[in-house]
Every structure is written in C-alpha cells, then in structure tokens.
Amino acid sequence: MVRVEGDRVLVETGTLTAVIEKGFITSLRSRRTGEEFIRPFDVSQEAALQLLYRSWDLVQLDDRAPKEGEIRCLQLSPERAQVVFHCWDGDGVIEITADPDTGDLIIEPSAYGSRPGVVSCRWVIRGLREDLELVAPVKQGLRLPLDDPLIKGSRWEWPMFWEAQLAILQGDKSGLWVHSQDTRFRYKALRVGSESDAHALGLETEAYGPVEGNLGAGGVAWGVNVYDGDWRVPAARYRDWLWKAYDLAAEERKRPAWLPTITLALSWCPTDPDLLDALAQRVPPERVLLHVPNWRTDQYDENYPAFVASDEGKAFIRKAQAMGFHLAPHFNTVDMDPTGPVYPLLRDFQYRDLWSGRLHGWGWADGGYLSVPESNLARTKHRDKKVMVKIHPGLAMWRSVLGESILAAAQDLPLDTVFTDVSLCVSNLQNAMVEGMTPAEGMLRLIRDVSSLGDGLAVGGEGLNEITMQGLTFAQAHLLTEDPEQLKRPYACDLNQFLWGKLCRIIGYTHCGGQSETDRLVRAVYDAQGAIPTLTVDSAEEITSPTPEVEEVLRKAGR
C-alpha cells in the first residue's frame, strides 16, 4: 500500500511501514517487531533531493525561504506516488512504489536544473539511529559507525570504490539496508553522512560523461527494507539476485578446480629459483599461487602491451610449473606505454577524468608520482619516467591488440593463468561511452576476452567489484588505510567474499612482508576479509629463516 495523506506518503509492505515527508524517510519500522530505525530530525535543515555539479557545488532542492519553492505529494495509483519538487535551483521527482514480493520500499529519484554541469542526483536518508553501523562493500568489506573518522564525509564511486550497489545498517540483532538492482552499468556513488547529519547516507545516480552540458540525472531505483539477524541476511538476498541477474552459476563452472585449494599466495614474487625450493619445503606447491611481476624483457610498467619473456623469467616460470606451483605472470588491462608503436592507433580513446578532463594514468620519477603529460609530443618521449595512459576497454581495437599480445606470451611459455593489472579502473569518465560500453562493461568484456584466449586462462586482477568478479578468479585487495593507528581498530569484515568468494578469491596487495607491526595489523585486516594468506618476500632466506609473522603464515598454509 502506498497512500498520500496531505504532505506525507505512507507505505506499508509485508515487512515494513514507512512515512516519507519532503522526500525524506521520517519513519521506518519493522512490521514484525515494531522496531523503529529512524530517529526524529528536522526535515527543513537540508533537502532530501540534491544536485552535485562538476565544480563540486551541491545544490539543495528545498522550499526554504528566501528561496521559496514547492514540494508536494501526488497519488498516481493505489500502489504508486510521487514527491514533486519545484524549487529555486532545480526541479525533480521522487517516485515511490513497493515490491509486493520482497516487501521493499522502492525509491527512484531524479532531478535537473537549467545550469549545465550536473554530475549526479543525490537522495538522502537521514536520521539513522546512532547505534547502527555501516556494513558496506568498500575496500573488500568494512563495518564502522557512520561517524567514524575513517569514513565520515566520504564519497565512494561505484563500482571502483563502492564495489557493489548496496549498503547495510546493522544494529544489535536487526537492521535496514538499501540496494539497487540496476544491470545497465549506470554509475552511482555512496556518500557517508550529509550536510547536517553524520548518521545519514546519500545515494547518487550519476550521468554518463561528458557532463559539461548535462542538466540532470536519475533513473536508478533504490530498494529499502528491514531485516532480522546480522548483515548476512540481506547480503545473502543480494547475492542470490546477483547470481540470477548475471547467470553466475555458469561462471562458477568455469573456475579452475584448484581455486578453493590455495592456502598461500605470494604477491610481487621475484624470479628467484631458490625461492621456489624454499617454498616447496614448507607448503605443497599445488596449494601456492604466485603473482610474478618482473618476467619480461622490459622493465616493470614499461612498454605495455609488449609481453616478451626474458631468459630469467622464462626459466623461473618453467621451473615453477614443473614443481606444480600456480603462477600468474603480470600483464595489464588498460594501461599502455605512449612511446610504443600502437599508441597512434589508440590515442583518441584514452581515459579522461570526468571532473578535471585530465588524462588518467601516471608517470614515475625520483621515487615520486607524475601526472600524465598533456603535451601530445611529451607523452611519446619519456619511457624512462614510466609514463602510462589508459585506453578505454570498450574499444574493440584495444582488446584485439592486447589479446594478441597476451595470447602470444601464453602460448610461448605456456600459461594457464595470468594476472591483469589495474582491472579496478572502471570509473565514470569524460568519455564514458565507447562503442556503446562504459569502462565497467568494457572491462568485463576485456576480462572475458582474455579468459577465452587459447585453451582458456584463469584471470587475476587488481581490486575487485561486482562487475569484474564475474570474470576474475583471484584479485589483489587494496586497504582502506595503511595508518598503523587506524589499523589497530577492527574495521574489516568479509562482506565481499561472502557475496562472491565462490567465483573470485582475494589476496594481499601491500604490507605482506611480515617484517613490522604494520604488516601484522594488515594481515589481521586481510584475514577478517577472507583473503588467501599472502606473503611478499624478496629472497629465499625470508622463507628459510622467517620472522615470527612469516612463520605463522607458512605454518597455517602448510597444514
């Protein structure tokens, strides 16, 4: 039931009752228990519907004086209502329905103005009870109070940083959650906190870039519901939807049989044959996954997409294969060296930032980061500074060039597993659409193209989200923080591995050397997130004469 009563919309489903005023949910109760999840707040403090501009200006669609406006409720049918906004700086609609099967309250916001440059439409859920903790697919799973300094005021773009389109608010033995079932690769963002309330969430729908002339955004529906139990209850429902929406049962059948048997991973593994002998003394090789970055004739992060094995790299790979190790030489997804011969063929399809218009990528010199040169000439002259640009994966020509190069290496060595770097780089862009695909959709297509090369390849990646996990077998996981003091607080949870660990497992990315207190704290984070125990070592001696931390990892992996 969705019913308008004056300036309020009342909603009743099989699971909840809700009251909506001026676009805000001002009451959300469990029908089973009567538990209320929203505390009282002043709906006039800020607007429920907002526009975010490319300049980072946030415009409120409200009716506060002196910028007077009108916000009214409209009954369209017994099961459908709208909150209509006619305000000083823009207009908008919040569509309100209910799902009779799930009991979800469905909210679909949209807004626009005459001023160009709109990036997103934001709908705000305010007044969340202060005991509720955010459980979110950010950096492979976090659980923190909304006002925690690690996340307060933060904004996470889907799917690169907000890795699945859901957010869970966990109480003692119950909670509420919000999610989308969008399958059109619509860009979104999650804002933690609002202008007037730390205990709030902002749910954004972004327009595809370019946005310089864009006037509005919308078109994504958000489902809100309550639940009994812990966060795994709504997460399981979302996982079930994922499996059906993307036919992931078929993807499960493609994963290698060795994936669940891996008990140890080495990130950034050196090509030292003695290291293989030392590892084999502690852990059966068939249970070890090696990420090998420096196996080519070229230096690391230079001359992509050229993948030619050096004699040293080839000897290491063949010895590891003969011993039974699973190894993944380091390739890439979208990075390429602009000093290379294929750059002129692809230059028109480089990633450009949605906000600044600058080229995505980097250079590296004197131990520090450099931006990509904006001189077309300079970009082609500085291999010594490891300049890399990113080519949109929606471009079929790029996937062809990359695939041909990876296939040649895979057949030469030969390989059954590869690691593809920067697969997490799938954000909205100034040039978001190439050949009808966003970077997110294009990256999934690229990963699947690589996995189908030759007789088939298991593909690893950097970072992991609900799009790339559909094609990846394993992925390096980035940390929310590397600050030792912040790491002492148990912020991590295994939400992401709960969602898709059957398809793709995570391994450590950094601080896996077991040499410091920071390394120990990082291992606790990765353990909490369900990662494969991971080491980063420089020599065989670190295995034969391990620190206590390394010894603990080896002992568990070898059991």
Task: Label each region the model flagged.
Residues 260-358, 363, 397-404, 441-447:
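Aromatic- and glycine-enriched glycan-recognition loops and surfaces
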Residues 204-205, 213-219, 223, 396, ...:
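Active-site-proximal substrate-binding groove within the catalytic cores of carbohydrate-active enzymes
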Residues 271-272, 296-301, 334-339, 425-430, ...:
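Flexible loop/turn segments at secondary-structure boundaries
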Residues 316-325, 408-416, 449-458, 529:
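A structural motif corresponding to the C-terminal end of an alpha-helix
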Residues 10-289, 294, 310-315, 319, ...:
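Carbohydrate-recognition beta-sandwich/jelly-roll modules
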Residues 318, 329-408, 483-502:
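Active-site-adjacent "subsite" loops/lids of carbohydrate-active enzymes
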Residues 1-5:
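Short, Gly/Pro- and small/polar-rich lid/capping loops
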Residues 286-295, 401-432:
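Active-site groove signature of glycoside hydrolases
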